[in-house]
Amino acid sequence: MRRFFLGAIAISILLVATGIGTTVTLAGSGPLKPGDTLFPLQYFAEQSQGELITTDIGAAKHFISIAGRRAVDLGSIAGTSDELLSIYYLDQALDQAAVAVAKTERTEIEIFRLDLVDLLLQIRDSASKLSVVPIEDPDVYNGLIAKIESLQNLIVNPDSV
């Protein structure tokens, strides 16, 4: 029995050390981007964190922040074969941000207006750098541009809904 406990303790220490080492390595390498092998783990963590937020304002800020990260990712991935995947994750993040903002009180939407404007400017900048998707998948690219314009119209004139 003693041998079992010593083995279990050794395995536990090994797992903790491996976890710490992996965390330090990932933290040192910067945030992951769509197309990276471990990006789905980061995506899962972001989604899980969003589900734990209990206020509508907090959730909206969280998902706007994630959409901002995806917009930056899109710009840094421009010119690679991962553009389409990055657009997919950006599209998902925009949908989540829009739903989260819609759940807030109408009077609280002003809190997010500047963040949303900054987000849309970042997306426009990143989209202008794309070179693969506009040629290989013009419908996807045009859909992204249409979504940006639609969200911009909602920000400029929220009463038009």
Question: Where are the regions that the model predicts?
Answer:
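Long, charged/polar, soluble alpha-helical segments
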Residues: 1-161
